[in-house]
């Protein structure tokens, strides 16, 4: 860049990556005094997305402010959530996303607090903690949400107020906790004495006494502005807070999304109404009236939901069209009557088939019962025969055992006598049966 007699000529390279605007102070005036601009430092250069630079006090150009929108902030938050799935991977992307989110949020949702801050005096003395209480008019406005208005979504409004005033903003007192049960349990305990007081905003400032008074005065003034209820529908701060909360929660819908949703709902309603319109058209045909879309008829602009359309004045071709519609209606009625007759015949055939099936089932059950009785009688006879055979076998076994016992006893008697007889005659004196399986007693002569 060459400068000659206050004339600046810009020399850009072949790539033309960046163009810089340099503010040249005007020449000295007639009085000989040099003009001093608003700031003695170097000019601030802000690079816009289009490559145009413009100075700005807060580092955000006018073109950027026009481009920022709630949809853009919602997209940035979604991108940040996607980056969170890869922790410690895209360090620069996370930092750039956070910076852009903060910048857009400041432009869109920054509360318009008073920018005229009183100059702070020089520090005198030691730093101490100074507090102020601003009571909330909850009794005058019991249905107004003062706590949410002061804190904002995720405490963003209170944080912004803390940054601008240099004080700490806290909501204390009865009704300051979201969990009412926990509030009742903690009331009266140490470090929870504020729950016994009325709802108020506690402002703390840690600084020297002379500087803390200035900070507290400004903070009290801004808090009192927030405690003035705005009319319904005219609260711009509440609108911004609700929009920011919806964006944070991911439930924000832009105007484009809402119009698309409305179009989808309308299409669904039309799709559901198509069967109803077809039913109305069929009813009109059955009554011998032309359908709604038939040519050659002029109807009233409004028509009842149910019933036939009102024919106001048929044209010249109405007679031929009416005859055609009548013949079509008669044909449809004939087809419907034939269909009903066929359905009735099918129903009668089905009833007859069902009766035949029931009769066959009853006969089959009777046959099964009779066969089951025969099978049971023969089985009983077989069981009785088996029992008789078992009894006969048992009696034969008992008789054989008795005979074997008698023979054994006779053999024992013969061996015990140990006498030899030349000839003898056996005479049966008595025959006694002493018990079951008894034996005969013989006397030897």
Swiss-Prot record:
PROSITE patterns xref list: KH_TYPE_1
Biased composition, class Polar residues, residue ranges: 42-63
Region (Qua1 domain): 71-128
Expressing tissues: Isoform b: Expressed in the hypodermis and pharyngeal muscles. Isoform c: Expressed in body wall muscles and phayngeal muscles.
Gene Ontology terms: cellular component: nucleus; P granule; ribonucleoprotein complex
KH domain boundaries: 145-171
Keyword ATP-binding part of the UniProt annotation: no
CDD domains, sorted: KH-I_HOW
Effect of loss of the gene: Defective alternative splicing of the unc-60 gene which results in decreased expression of the muscle-specific isoform of unc-60. Double knockout with isoform c of unc-60 rescues the motility and actin filament disorganization defects in the single unc-60 isoform c mutant. RNAi-mediated knockdown results animals that are viable throughout embryonic and larval development, and furthermore, results in defective alternative splicing of the let-2 gene, whereby transcripts containing exon 10 are not formed in larvae and so the muscle-specific isoform of let-2 is not expressed in body wall muscles.
Domain of life from the UniProt record: Eukaryota
GO BP term, example: RNA splicing
Entry keywords, A to Z: mRNA processing, mRNA splicing, Nucleus, RNA-binding
Residues the UniProt record annotates as site (Involved in RNA binding): 145, 168, 172, 238, 241
Span list, region Qua2 domain: 230-253
Gene Ontology molecular function: any one: mRNA binding
Site (Important for RNA binding): 178
UniProt key word Nucleus: yes
Subcellular location: Nucleus
Region (Disordered) location: 22-63
Site for Important for the interaction between KH and Qua2 domains, residues: 153, 245
Complex formation: Interacts with sup-12; in the presence of RNA, but with weak affinity in the absence of RNA.
Domain-related comment: The KH domain and the Qua2 region are involved in RNA binding.
Chain's role: RNA-binding protein that binds to the 5'-NACUAAY-N(1,20)-UAAY-3' consensus sequence in pre-mRNA introns to promote alternative splicing. Required for mutually exclusive alternative splicing where it modulates the switch between mutually exclusive exons during pre-mRNA maturation. Involved in muscle-specific gene expression regulating the alternative splicing of genes such as let-2 and unc-60 to ensure that their respective isoforms are expressed in muscle.
Name of protein: RNA-binding protein asd-2
């Amino acid at each position: 860049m060459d400068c000659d007699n206050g004339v600046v000529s810009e020399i850009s390279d072949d790539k033309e990556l960046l163009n810089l605007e340099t503010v040249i102070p005007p020449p000295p005036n007639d009085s000989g005094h040099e003009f001093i601009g608003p700031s003695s430092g170097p000019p601030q250069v802000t690079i816009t997305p289009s490559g145009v630079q413009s100075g700005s006090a807060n580092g955000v150009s006018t073109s950027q402010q026009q481009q920022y929108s709630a949809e853009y902030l919602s997209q940035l938050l979604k991108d940040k959530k996607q980056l969170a799935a890869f922790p410690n991977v895209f360090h620069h992307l996370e930092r750039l996303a956070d910076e852009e989110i903060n910048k857009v949020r400041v432009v869109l949702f920054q509360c318009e607090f008073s920018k005229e801050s009183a100059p702070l005096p020089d520090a005198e003395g030691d730093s101490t903690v100074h507090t102020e209480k601003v009571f909330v008019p909850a009794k005058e406005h019991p249905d107004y949400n003062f706590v949410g208005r002061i804190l904002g979504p995720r405490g963003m409004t209170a944080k912004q107020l803390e940054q601008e005033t240099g004080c700490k903003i806290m909501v204390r007192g009865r009704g300051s906790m979201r969990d009412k049960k926990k509030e009742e349990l903690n009331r009266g305990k140490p470090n929870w004495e504020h729950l016994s007081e009325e709802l108020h905003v506690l402002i703390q400032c840690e600084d020297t006494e002379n500087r803390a008074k200035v900070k507290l005065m400004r903070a009290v003034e801004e808090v009192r502005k927030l405690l003035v209820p705005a009319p319904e529908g005219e609260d711009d701060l509440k609108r911004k807070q609700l929009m920011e909360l919806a964006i944070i929660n991911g439930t924000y819908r832009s105007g484009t999304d809402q119009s698309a949703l409305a179009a989808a709902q309308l299409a669904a309603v039309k799709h559901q109404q198509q069967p109803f319109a077809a039913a109305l058209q069929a009813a009109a045909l059955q009554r011998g009236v032309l359908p709604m879309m038939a040519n050659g008829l002029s109807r009233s602009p409004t028509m009842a939901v149910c019933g036939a359309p009102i024919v106001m004045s048929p044209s010249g071709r109405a007679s031929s069209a009416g005859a055609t519609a009548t013949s079509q209606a008669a044909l449809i009625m004939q087809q419907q009557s034939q269909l009903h007759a066929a359905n009735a015949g099918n129903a009668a055939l089905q009833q007859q088939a069902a009766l035949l099936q029931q009769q066959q089932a009853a006969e089959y059950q009777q046959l099964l019962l009779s066969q089951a009785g025969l099978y049971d009688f023969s089985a009983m006879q077989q069981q009785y025969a088996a029992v008789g055979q078992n009894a006969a076998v048992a009696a034969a076994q008992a008789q054989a055992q008795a005979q074997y016992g008698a023979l054994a006893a006779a053999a024992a008697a013969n061996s015990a006598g140990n006498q030899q007889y030349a000839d003898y005659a056996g005479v049966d004196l008595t025959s006694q049966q002493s018990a079951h399986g008894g034996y005969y007693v013989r006397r030897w002569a």
